[in-house]
Every structure is written in structure tokens, then in C-alpha cells.
Amino acid sequence: MVDIDAEVVEECKKHLPEMHQGAFEDPRTRVLNEDARGYLEKTSERFDLIVVDLVEPLEEGPACLLFTKEFYGLIRDRLTDQGVMTMQAGMTKINELHFYGAVSRTLREVFPVVAPYQGFVSCFGTPWGFMLASKGTDPRRQSAEEIDRLIAARLNPDELGYWNGGAHLHSFNLPKFLSQAVERNDRVITDANPLIVS
């Protein structure tokens, strides 16, 4: 895990045990307190999964250059051939879709497979948008039964409070207004022309 803010990570360890469920004590976990982009630029490691969970790109904020075509290119180059990246991409309220559409459009400049999805995030009180991007793996081609089998092979399905085969299919089946926002957006976010959310 790469996070620029060591203090926030420590506070999460202390105060959010129900969220991390001991993941920080897992011997496979390494926490690096540094800039994620800088880390990807210098590492030669390859990853099966990269999860990008950022604050939105606010003016003068640290995340502005972590939503760009160039950053997504770094992620692509650090994924294994079957690797995937997933990220949060803002709320999916009907009149708040420019950011979601621009992230999708930018990812399509870099990855051959981009699968937008959404889920309800109770602490935000609204549906929230996410993206999955890869060099070839497409989660929309998996049946509910296949997803349930994959989950059961890796962990106890009863420990998951949300995801199963049905939720998987539902999340990737976007309502018409959301599909249109993704298809019609032509904004490509770059280092030279970052998107700022106000």
C-alpha cells in the first residue's frame, strides 16, 4: 500500500478496525508512505491488482496529477498481462457526471478494456462510480455463477457483506443516463490539462 499521508494511515489503523479487519498485520502487507506516482515511476515491480483510492482532484490538491493519461500509463506499465486496476471515480448522480465521464474517457486512451461500474456507498448517501481497466480482462464477461465460484475458491463468501455474483452483474449494468455520460464525454485529462473538481 502506498499512501502519502502516514498520519492518516496510523489513524485508520487505530480507529477503523472494522474496515481494515487486520490487513495491516498480514505479513504480505507493506505500507510505503510516499507519493504513489513517484513510487510507480521508480519501481520495476509488476502487480496483478492496483487499487487507486484517492480524494477527488481539488484545486492545488495532491491528487490532480493522479487522474491523468500519463499516470494511467504508469499504472498500465506496472500491471501484469492479466492484471487489473480499479479506482473510485466520483459520484454518479444524474447532474454530476462530468468527472466520471472524463475519467472513463481518459482511461480509454490508455487501456484496451475499461469497465465503468457503480455501487451505493452508504457513508456518502449516494451511488458512487468506479472504473476497472485492464490489458485484456473484462469483468463484464463473467456470469454470476462464475463470480460466486471464484469468491468461494478464495475466501468464505459469508464474510463478504456486499459482493456476490448478482451484485457483480448489477454493478456493471449501468443505467442509460450513466452509459450516455460515459459514451458522450470527450474530455481527456492530461498532466498539461488536469481536471479540477470544484
Model-flagged regions — what are they?
Residues 19, 23-26, 58, 86, ...:
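A near-ubiquitous, low-amplitude feature marking generic local secondary-structure context
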Residues 9-12, 108-113, 150-152:
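A short linear-motif detector with a strong N-terminal bias
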Residues 25, 48, 102, 131-133, ...:
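General N-terminal targeting signals
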Residues 42, 61-142:
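C-terminal substrate-binding/active-site "lid" region of AdoMet-derived donor-dependent transferases
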Residues 116-198:
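Soluble small-group transferase modules, centered on the S-adenosyl donor enzyme superfamily
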Residues 1-84, 94-100:
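The AdoMet/dcAdoMet-binding core of the Class I SAM-like
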Residues 21-25, 53-55, 72-75, 107-110, ...:
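Short, surface-exposed linear patches
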